[in-house]
């Protein structure tokens, strides 16, 4: 499976310019060999939290329409990061994915809101776990958002249910880059799966985003990584490595869920 990761500099509070930027990246970088494209967290408006009442998408309407067009045009599955999204008068940080036929194949609201950013004052936390879902080739994957990375429990269910890839979409700060590396590697090792961390780059006020989008294999080895600059990372994944690692180190056969209460 060939995966292409878009490490974008999100334009603060301007969904139109962000859509234009993404469109240009597709036009410049897409080719028929790519199976999956991945976008970062909150790519429509960034963390313009105080103005999301006016700027957030309405029930994924605009964001889904935009991504659906790209998926159908380029015949590619898109793990579409996440967007600020109003539903039932509440604002969510909503991750979603669209297959190459233009079908919505996943929707997930960020469960863990970041207290350090006062997200709870502006956003509503999701109430459902991240589910496994199928890409066009039948591969089961899952999609989580940024701060979710610090909660290993959230990935256990989709991993145990057969997901072979975990996509963490993020706006992760440079000040915690060491945590980004360590936590992504840990999630890959403990679940015997590929983990893909897709981050943004650039500045949002005084916050510098770390970039360093990264792919880690089920053994915890580095497959590919970007630096802090805006760029694209393309990797080829051998998904047989997941089954091999789960046979060699059968953690899900050894797990004792009844004891972990």
UniProtKB/Swiss-Prot annotation:
Its EC number is 3.5.1.3. Keywords: Hydrolase. SUPFAM superfamilies: Carbon-nitrogen hydrolase (SSF56317). It catalyses: a monoamide of a dicarboxylate + H2O = a dicarboxylate + NH4(+). GO terms for molecular function: omega-amidase activity. The active site is at residues 41, 110, 146. Residues 1-239 form the CN hydrolase domain. Gene3D superfamilies: Carbon-nitrogen hydrolase. InterPro entries: C-N_Hydrolase, C-N_Hydrolase_sf, UPF0012_CS. PANTHER family: DEAMINATED GLUTATHIONE AMIDASE, NITRILASE-RELATED. Belongs to the carbon-nitrogen hydrolase superfamily. NIT1/NIT2 family. Hydrolyzes alpha-ketoglutaramate (a-KGM) to alpha-ketoglutarate (alpha-KG) and ammonia (specific activity 3.87 umol/min/mg), has weak activity on L-glutamine, almost no activity on deaminated glutathione (dGSH) and none on glutathione. May function as a metabolite repair enzyme. This is Omega-amidase YafV. The lineage of its organism: Bacteria, Bacillati, Bacillota, Bacilli, Bacillales. The gene is yafV.
């Amino acid at each position: 499976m060939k995966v292409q990761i878009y490490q974008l500099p999100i334009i603060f509070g301007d969904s139109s310019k962000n859509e234009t930027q993404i469109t240009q990246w597709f036009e410049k970088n897409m080719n028929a060999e790519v199976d999956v494209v991945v976008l970062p967290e909150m790519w429509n408006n960034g963390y313009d939290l105080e103005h999301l009442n006016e700027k957030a998408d309405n029930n994924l309407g605009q964001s889904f329409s935009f991504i659906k067009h790209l998926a159908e045009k380029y015949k590619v599955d898109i793990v579409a990061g996440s967007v600020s999204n109003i539903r039932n008068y509440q604002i969510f940080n909503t991750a979603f994915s669209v297959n190459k036929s233009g079908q919505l194949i996943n929707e997930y609201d960020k469960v863990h809101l970041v207290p350090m950013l006062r997200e709870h004052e502006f956003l509503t936390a999701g109430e459902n776990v991240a589910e496994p879902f199928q890409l066009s080739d039948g591969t089961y994957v899952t999609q989580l958002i940024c701060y979710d990375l610090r909660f290993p429990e959230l990935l256990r269910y989709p991993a145990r249910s057969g997901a072979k890839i975990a996509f963490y979409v993020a706006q992760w700060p440079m000040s915690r880059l060491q945590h980004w590396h360590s936590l992504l590697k840990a999630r890959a090792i403990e679940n015997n799966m590929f983990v893909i961390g897709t981050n943004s780059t650039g500045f949002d006020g005084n916050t510098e985003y770390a970039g360093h989008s990264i792919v880690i294999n089920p053994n915890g080895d580095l497959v590919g990584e970007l630096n802090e600059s805006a760029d694209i990372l393309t990797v080829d994944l051998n998904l047989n490595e997941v089954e091999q690692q789960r046979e060699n180190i059968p953690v899900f056969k050894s797990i004792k869920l009844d004891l972990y209460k």
